[in-house]
């Protein structure tokens, strides 16, 4: 009889936390839209991508580490090798790979493209959750079929953005080409330039390379969310999770920059680059990752990832105003399919959550945990009571 008691005792608090998490994630995506535009300005000046990432990460770590140490020193669990390995992979995927691939992709595209492909993150997160066993799909029900169909539609939209750009609907296409060519000659660390040259020799265009890197950026972010959610159950200090992830990511970024950045002048930043680093380090890194980790603990990675579609509108609007970036037909069509697939998955998830919550109210001992990652915090705790049991075999055990 404990399930109803848990719901009654903490339901209002869980709902309040969930509302705050949803609001926080909306602001995170708004801040990300501004980050796309501000970073593009820095790339236009010719900042080295690795130098930018190193400065950003060091600034973010200098904020997150003291906050985590003083605020959570009483709730941190003892460290072990398994936790250290998890934090390393979080830093590798969510900080190192995520940031570097995004900047390379943004260099060869524009903020509109960078934001338009972000809605694929929820689908990649869903696929990883299925492979990890934290998300289950029943293909005999309409919800499961819609999830799979929405996943395929979203992936199709992402692929479409890679293979087709089309005419510029708004803005000057030639100006965009000239801007990308100018950027590619400045601020490129040698191995990155060599890698880009290799793709160009294979017949790829610069925008192909850019979109492929942006897809890799989305896959890294999905991996970060999928790994972080179960880790937060074992290590509930969310600020410390963000700080430790940034520690390993910063170590990887600094090590890479040490070997790849050859020119001492690359470490000298202009005023606009310094402002971009401050925004990236304080807002897009420390604040956003802190809010993201806390929200992931409250509402789970699937719902956290579902807020990424807010980025395209904000980024396209801001980049069109401040940068004059063109909007291409490929980004519009591909973005439409990405968002269509996203909301197919969202609708199916909502239906399953509604059914599961209704089942709790009618027969609490028959609770099914088909989607533990997208319940609210209270339902997540209920799901943990039955961890290790298949959902179909959960019975009353008074």
UniProtKB/Swiss-Prot annotation:
TM segment ranges: 27-47, 50-70, 84-104, 113-133, 150-170, 207-227, 241-261, 274-294, 298-318, 321-341
SUPFAM superfamilies with a match to the protein in the record: Multidrug resistance efflux transporter EmrE (SSF103481)
Domain (EamA) ranges: 32-144, 237-346
Membrane topology: Multi-pass membrane protein
Pfam families reported in the protein's UniProt record: EamA (PF00892)
GO molecular function, one term: transmembrane transporter activity
Subcellular localization(s) per the UniProt record: Membrane
GO cellular component term, pick one: membrane
Designated name of the protein: WAT1-related protein At4g19185
